[in-house]
Amino acid sequence: MKILVMNCGSSSLKYQLINMENEEVLAIGLAERIGIAGARVKHEASGKEKVTIEQPMENHKTAIKIVLEALIDENYGAIKSMDEIAAVGHRVVHGGERFSSSVVVTDDVKNALEECSDLAPLHNPPNLMGIEACQEILPNVPMVGVFDTAFHQTMPESSYMYALPYELYEKHKIRRYGFHGTSHKYVAMKAAEILERPIEDLKIIACHLGNGASITAVDGGISVDTSMGFTPLEGLVMGTRCGDMDPAIVTFLMEKEKIDHNQVNAIMNKQSGVYGLSGVSSDFRDIEVAVKEGNKRAQLALDVYYKRVKKYIGAYAAEMGGVDAVVFTAGLGENSPETRKSICEGLEFLGIKIDNTKNNVRGKETVVSTDDTPTKVLLIPTNEELAIARETKSLI
C-alpha cells in the first residue's frame, strides 16, 4: 500500500510518497511559489537524482497535477501509475472542537473545516484547497484529514479554558487548542517503544523545539496540557514569536506606538522571540555564533528561551505528579546538544541529568541521560509525514 502525504501551505506544497509495507519513503518533494512568478517543484525519488521542475503553477490544483506527473515520470518517478496511490493523507492545522482524531474527508468534514477557518485563517484555507484539488484529480482515492489539534482534544477543561467570561467561549469558541499534536503523539509513542514500557504507564514531557515550539504533558499516552493555546503564539519563546506575555501589553503598544491590532500582531508573531531579543536572527545557529563572539543580547535571548522551557517542564511535572521521560524533538531539539544541556541543567531534583558524551549527537534516536537517573531524557527525530501516513492507513 502506497500513501501520498501532503502538507499544503498558502504558496507551497510539501509531499512524500510512502510504501506502508516497509514504511520506506519512495519520493519526497516541495512545490513552491504557487500562484506567483518563479514556481517550481523540487522532487527526489528514492535511488534517483534530484530534479527541479520549473513550470507556472496558478493554483494548488496545477501544482498537484505537476507533482503527480513527477511521481509517475519514467525517468525520475517512483511509481508507474497513479492507480498505485491507495490514499492521500493531508495535514490539517486546525480541527477545532469537532475533530479529536483523524477522519476520512467527506462533504460534511469539508464544511466543518471551513467553519474552523476563522481559528486558523492562514493555514486551514490552503489545507482545504489541497484536499479539494486532490479530490478533483484523484476522484476515486480516499482523502484523510490528520489534525495538528486533534491529539490535544483529550485535555481537561481545567487545562483548556481561559478565565474569560464563559459566554465568550460559548459564542466564539475561545479556548486553548494546542498544536504540533501529530509530532507530540509520534515522539511520545516512540519514547515508550525505546524505553520498552507501556505508554499507559508513562508520564512524558515532549519538547517540540523548532522555529515554532511547544511542550506537551502526555500522561498515559494522552495529552493533558500543552503550551500553545488559542493560536500558536502562546507558550514558549520561539524564533520570531513572543510566547507568553501580559496581554495588557497589546493595548499599551497600540496607544503608545499609535498602531492597530494588525501591526501588534505582526510584532508579536514576526518580530519577537529570539529574533526580537537578540537583534541577530531567528536561527539559533546564528545566535550561538553571536554568543561566542560576546554578543550580550544574543546570550539574553538564549537565557530567556531556556528559562521558559524549564518553567514548562517543571509545571508539567507538577501537573502530572512526576515525570518518567523528557523528549526533545524538531530542528533545535534534535540538532543542538547545547540547547538540551542548558535546558536540563538545574532539573536534577526531577531526576533529570544529561550525559555529556551521549548528548553530543545530532538527529539520532537515542537516550542522552545518565544511566543512573530515574527520569530518562531522549532525543527522538520527529516524523510527522510517517505519522500522517500511519493514521491514513488505519482509516482505509
Swiss-Prot record:
ATP binds at K14, H208, L209, G210, N211, G212, D283, F284, R285, G331, L332, G333, E334, N335. GO terms for biological process: acetate metabolic process; acetyl-CoA biosynthetic process. Its cofactor is Mg(2+); Mn(2+). It is found in: Cytoplasm. Mg(2+). Can also accept Mn(2+). The gene is ackA. The keyword Transferase applies. It catalyses: acetate + ATP = acetyl phosphate + ADP. The record marks H180, R241 as: Transition state stabilizer. Its EC number is 2.7.2.1. It holds the Pfam family Acetate_kinase. GO terms for cellular component: cytoplasm. Its main location: cytoplasm. NCBIfam families: ackA. Homodimer. Substrate binds at R91. Mg(2+) binds at N7, E384. Keywords: ATP-binding, Cytoplasm, Kinase, Magnesium, Metal-binding, Nucleotide-binding, Transferase. Belongs to the acetokinase family. GO terms for molecular function: acetate kinase activity; ATP binding; magnesium ion binding. Catalyzes the formation of acetyl phosphate from acetate and ATP. Can also catalyze the reverse reaction. PANTHER family: ACETATE KINASE (PTHR21060), ACETATE KINASE-RELATED (PTHR21060:SF15). It comes from Alkaliphilus metalliredigens (strain QYMF). It is an enzyme of class 2 (transferase). The keyword Amino-acid biosynthesis does not apply. This is Acetate kinase. Pathway: Metabolic intermediate biosynthesis; acetyl-CoA biosynthesis; acetyl-CoA from acetate: step 1/2. The active site is at D148.
